[in-house]
């Protein structure tokens, strides 16, 4: 019975820790609005609902977005 209680307390503490970490990341003033963090690439990406421009190829937020290298500033196309 003591083991079960210990496991439940541990699980609760882990859930609280993860929730606190997530809320800190969302509320962090260094986390600019209009950008999202791409964990795979380790960079902030500019978000746009439709269209928009990007200064670098990795600035497009939506996964299906492709930045044209022919135009300057590059144009984001969403597929």
From Swiss-Prot:
Signal sequence region: 1-23
Disulfide bonds: 47-61, 54-67, 60-76
Origin superkingdom: Eukaryota
Primary site of residence: secreted
Modified residues (Tyrosine amide): 78
A cellular-component GO term for this protein: nematocyst
Pfam families per record: Conotoxin (PF02950)
GO terms of molecular function: acetylcholine receptor inhibitor activity; ion channel inhibitor activity; toxin activity
Cell compartments where the protein resides: Secreted; Nematocyst
Propeptide span(s): 24-46
Residue ranges crossing the lipid bilayer per the database entry: none
UniProt keywords, alphabetically: Acetylcholine receptor inhibiting toxin, Amidation, Cleavage on pair of basic residues, Disulfide bond, Knottin, Nematocyst, Neurotoxin, Postsynaptic neurotoxin, Secreted, Signal, Toxin
Entry text on domains: The presence of a 'disulfide through disulfide knot' structurally defines this protein as a knottin.
Other facts noted in the record for this chain: Negative results: does not show activity on rat TRPV1, human TRPV3, rat TRPA1 channels, the human ghrelin receptor, human neurotensin receptor 1, rat ASIC1a and ASIC3 channels.
Function (record text): Alpha-toxins act on postsynaptic membranes, they bind to the nicotinic acetylcholine receptors (nAChR) and thus inhibit them. This toxin very weakly competes with alpha-bungarotoxin for binding to orthosteric sites on muscle-type T.carlifornicus (IC(50)=14.95 uM) and human alpha-7/CHRNA7 nAChRs (IC(50)>45 uM).
Name of the protein: Alpha-actitoxin-Ms11a-4
Species of the source: Metridium senile (Brown sea anemone)
């Amino acid at each position: 019975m003591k083991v079960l209680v210990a496991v439940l307390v541990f699980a609760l503490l882990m859930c609280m820790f993860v929730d606190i970490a997530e809320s800190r990341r969302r509320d962090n003033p260094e986390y600019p609005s209009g950008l999202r963090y791409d964990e795979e690439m380790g960079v902030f990406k500019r978000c746009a609902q439709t269209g928009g421009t990007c200064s670098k190829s990795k600035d497009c937020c939506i996964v299906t977005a492709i930045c044209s290298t022919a135009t300057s500033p590059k144009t984001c196309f969403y597929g």
